[in-house]
Amino acid sequence: MRILVEIAYQGNNFLGFQIQQNGRTVQQQFEKLLQRMHKRHVRIHPSSRTDRGVHAIQQYFHFDTELNIPMSQWQYAMNRTLPVDIYVNNVVTVDDDFHCRYDCVGKRYRYKVYQAQHRDPFQRGLKTFIPEPLDLDKMNRAAQQFIGTHDFTGFCSQKTEVESKVRTLYQSEIVKTDDGFDYIVTGSGFLYNMVRVLVAFLIEVGKGRHEVSDVPKLLESKNRKNVPFTAPAEGLYLEKIYLDENELLKDFGNDIKIHRKKSLQND
């Protein structure tokens, strides 16, 4: 039986989602829990692998089990054992051929920034602090330039190992908030550090160090040295996972292209 689990977590005290030899990760917490329940190792398969310090409002993983536990009890059994910075929101059965990575057709991230004269210790780890004034309208116009299908070689980590760095963005916008702004981006998939590099670039635009017209040229250059900065992890949230293409079409229109994964190239 294949089980799909929807979770949320606060990423400050995790070294990321993916299990590591030394260090606390989200995957480690769940596989340790499932091993106690099954008396054997049970591997989980996530929809996305967030980095150290990145939060998730909605994340999914699946696993296979032979345990005869009522579906209504899975959520309770997990939450009573998990640490306080992880919570299971829902547990359902899925078809045996369902795969969290392959069946994911889109993801939405939100990056939160607050602006003030000084740091707020209560925002630590939850939002990124920027003291300088920013031109949010100009940043939003630059953000819109990323919508569509592009090669994001120049806007991801140089450690990115996947062969194709072409991704499709359905949404890319700056939204003003009471204390700063959020950057909201939805796409077919994301490269390593791609969202944080996009944010860092848009902040440079807001400071007047880049122009809106620079975006096409930087995409064309495919040179990360032209976009050298990466925003901190602390303001980044994995906000939504699209497992249903109809939901993606409803949010962004029937004329968008749906990308189904043939390999694990997309983050």
From Swiss-Prot:
**InterPro entries named in the record:** PsdUridine_synth_cat_dom_sf, PsdUridine_synth_TruA, PsdUridine_synth_TruA_a/b_dom, PsdUridine_synth_TruA_C, TruA/RsuA/RluB/E/F_N
The protein's UniProt keywords, in alphabetical order, are: Isomerase, tRNA processing
Q: Give its E.C. classification number.
A: 5.4.99.12
Q: Which GO terms describe its biological process?
A: tRNA pseudouridine synthesis
Q: Which annotated residues bind substrate?
A: 109
Q: What class of enzyme is it?
A: isomerase
**Catalyses which reaction(s):** uridine(38/39/40) in tRNA = pseudouridine(38/39/40) in tRNA
Recorded GO MF terms: RNA binding; tRNA pseudouridine(38-40) synthase activity
Q: What residues form the catalytic site here?
A: 51 (nucleophile)
Family the UniProt entry places it in? Belongs to the tRNA pseudouridine synthase TruA family.
PANTHER family on file: PSEUDOURIDYLATE SYNTHASE, TRNA PSEUDOURIDINE SYNTHASE-LIKE 1
Self-association and partners? Homodimer.
Function description: Formation of pseudouridine at positions 38, 39 and 40 in the anticodon stem and loop of transfer RNAs.
Task: Write the protein's name.
Answer: tRNA pseudouridine synthase A
Q: Which organism is it from?
A: Staphylococcus aureus (strain bovine RF122 / ET3-1)
Q: Which gene encodes it?
A: truA
